[in-house]
Amino acid sequence: MNKTHLTDQKFSDFALHPLVIKAIENQGFYHCTPIQALSFPITLAGRDVAAQAQTGTGKTLAFLASVFNYLLTNAADETRQCEQPRALIMVPTRELAIQIYTDAETLSQFTSLKMGLAYGGDGYDKQLKILESGVDILIGTPGRIIDYAKQNFIHLNALQVIVLDEADRMYDLGFIKDIRWLFRRMPPAEKRLNMLFSATLSYRVRELSFEQMNHPEYIEVEPLQKIGSQIQEELFYPSNEDKMRLLQTLIEEEWPDRCIIFANTKQRCEDIWGHLVADGHRVGLLTGDVAQRKRIQILDDFSKGYLDILVATDVAARGLHIPKVTHVFNYDLPENVEDYIHRIGRTGRAGEKGYSISLACEAFASHLSTIEACTGHRIPTSEYNKEALLTDLPQPKRLQRHHRHYAGSRNQGASRKPRSPQ
């Protein structure tokens, strides 16, 4: 972590359980991020919190440390059965569930707390087998949790802690009815510790917190700065015919160590994938219809550096926590400003420098005014020389449905280097 991203307060300054502090410090973390420093005084006192915080601010550790602390310092009901988890963490996507589970495993290394996953699309029986053996902490998506609950594989009436992460996205994906169904099967709000985290504390998110929480305290982390100062934004206005060539030229010029390219539709993502693979790049494709096992493999390969570029839609990439992403390309400008903020928030994480490059073509340039109005600043604009765009590009490859969704190898002879930080 960059020191500018941290506060002067240490984890050991708070009344966290010694085993929680030991696990955190064992990972080399000693100082809190702002969201952690603000939330711990509330959650460690047993009070509810509703927090506005962007991804990359340390919010996952903020609520995981609070969950572990509560379970380690408050005994479970003596009548609790194995099908009754003590804590539930609800998230909008399976990728986010898996990432939080991985972080929780690290935090649990010195405890006897057991954890389970519940997400759709894969591993139904495997997940169920773990749940039937009994878990203290259940992490999952609303749909699969409801599935298990309706079949009485799990019961939520002994829950001591609830976390709702990315609450704003739960609305966007239509999960709120499911979430309310689950809340009705839990103990009353005053009988549990409730935590809500969201990129925005909009009216509907605050309404949900009022309904389902016990007088929550609201906190915000840098609410006036939606885009981190460490992210350098750049905007181009390409014609439709120049757009793909401009993207490929920029990639050649920037030569990013690790980048994510966002597009608004699955078809557009597949087109980009085909052009980049044909040009010799190592590329992964992440859209809504990619099978879960392939998604996990692609993300793992991208994180480990076997892939250099990830092409993704917003829904498929929501909640991803991938370190060291140097560049984000908005091939299409999103209609939703929150999607724009989420996209470019994949880079410049933990105080590191990041670059966001957007292409405002004829089809999506109309979205720019809303984005700039909501973020409160104009995106710096650059011009390109049409004559300097790459021309000797191979024909794009077509995606074979029975093949893995990535291929290619980076051209080892390329001489261009990434832009130096300014």
From Swiss-Prot:
Component of the RNA degradosome, which is a multiprotein complex involved in RNA processing and mRNA degradation. Belongs to the DEAD box helicase family. RhlB subfamily. Residues 398-407 have a biased composition (Basic residues). Keywords: ATP-binding, Cytoplasm, Helicase, Hydrolase, Nucleotide-binding, RNA-binding. Residues 394-422 are annotated as: Disordered. GO terms for cellular component: cytosol. A motif (Q motif) lies at residues 9-37. One of its GO terms (biological process) is RNA catabolic process. It catalyses: ATP + H2O = ADP + phosphate + H(+). Residues 245-390 form the Helicase C-terminal domain. ATP binds at residues 53-60. DEAD-box RNA helicase involved in RNA degradation. Has RNA-dependent ATPase activity and unwinds double-stranded RNA. GO terms for molecular function: ATP binding; ATP hydrolysis activity; RNA binding; RNA helicase activity. A motif (DEAD box) lies at residues 165-168. HAMAP family: DEAD_helicase_RhlB (MF_00661). This is ATP-dependent RNA helicase RhlB. It is an enzyme of class 3 (hydrolase). The gene is rhlB. Its EC number is 3.6.4.13. InterPro entries: DEAD/DEAH_box_helicase_dom, DEAD_box_RNA_helicase, Helicase_ATP-bd, Helicase_C-like, P-loop_NTPase, RNA-helicase_DEAD-box_CS, RNA_helicase_ATP-dep_RhlB, RNA_helicase_DEAD_Q_motif. Its main location: cytoplasm. It is found in: Cytoplasm. Residues 40-219 form the Helicase ATP-binding domain.
